[in-house]
Regions:
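Acidic (Asp/Glu) and glycine-rich low-complexity loops/linkers
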Residues: 2-12, 21-122, 126-139, 150-159, ...
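Tandem repeat domain/solenoid detector
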Residues: 118-126, 137-145, 155-167, 174-186, ...
Length: 270
């Protein structure tokens, strides 16, 4: 496995989010794209609806489908006051104002948009999306959790850098997955056509496939593939690729037919 397979995973975070995270004593200063964001009341949502989402912070975002962009917030007052929003090209950015990551509680942001094709999660927050489509792209950098209830995409490019978790169900034609660290991809209910997997560290992943699966594992990570996939692996360390053939449940032999009961004797003649 070449190192560029791991480094490429950080490209969506840089290109899509344009985020600079600078650690400080009192928290973190976040800038998404060319803007540090504005309160929700000041966000101009008159343009085209975004198709990409960036969350930088400890808050929770719930994404549902709808004809137009709509955003509502709830939760702890301090967290709500600290939220900052930005719209940059096709991306909606959600973060907090400088030095307000700690001791403010947690906010829940509900976003309605026509389509979600890419998301980036930086930090310890959570994203739950009803669906993703087309050429889906997911990047998790940190300890956050992202979930897609229904995936129906031609391809999925998934990167987990850190200890974050990803969960998905549905189907994708092609899966390109990179895990760098101890992250987990829990996708047992995701049917994949073909897959190319790279793991560096102790990360784990599970998905289903009947196609070609190629894995490169450096470390102690474990990849589990359910189905009838054609699997190949190159490993350095104790990492494993487990391809488990899953067939339809065996109905077993038919139960034996109960024997016929004895016939009743004829009645004697009078």
């Amino acid at each position: 496995m070449t190192i560029h397979r791991i480094l490429k995973g950080f490209a969506p975070l840089a290109a899509l989010a344009g985020a600079a995270l600078l650690a400080g004593c009192d928290g973190m200063n976040i800038k998404i794209g060319d803007s540090e964001g504005v309160p929700l009341a000041e966000l101009d949502m008159s343009g085209p609806a975004p198709t990409e989402l960036v969350l930088a912070g400890p808050d929770r975002v719930i994404v549902t489908e709808g004809d137009e962009l709509d955003i509502t917030v709830s939760g702890d007052d301090g967290a709500i006051e600290a939220l900052r929003f930005s719209l940059d090209d096709d991306s909606l950015g959600i973060s907090r104002e400088s030095d307000s990551w700690r001791d403010r509680g947690v906010a829940t942001v509900r976003v309605t948009m026509p389509s979600l094709t890419a998301m980036v999660l930086a930090g310890s927050g959570d994203i739950e999306a009803a669906s993703m489509s087309d050429e889906a792209d997911v990047t998790i950098a940190g300890s956050g959790t992202a979930k897609v209830v229904r995936m129906d995409a031609r391809s999925l490019d998934l990167t987990i850098a850190g200890s974050g978790d990803f969960e998905a169900a549905g189907s994708v034609g092609e899966l390109d997955m990179t895990i760098a660290g101890s992250g987990r991809a829990r996708m047992a209910d995701l049917q994949v056509g073909n897959a190319e997997i790279s793991v560096a560290g102790s990360g784990d992943a599970e998905f289903s496939s009947d196609g070609a699966v190629e894995a490169n594992i450096m470390g102690s990570g474990t990849i589990t593939v359910n189905g009838r996939a054609d699997c190949t692996v190159s490993a350095m360390g104790s990492g494993k690729l487990n391809c488990r053939e899953v067939r339809a449940a065996d109905t077993g032999p038919e139960a034996p037919r109960a024997p016929d009961g004895p016939e009743a004797p004829e009645a004697p003649e009078a």
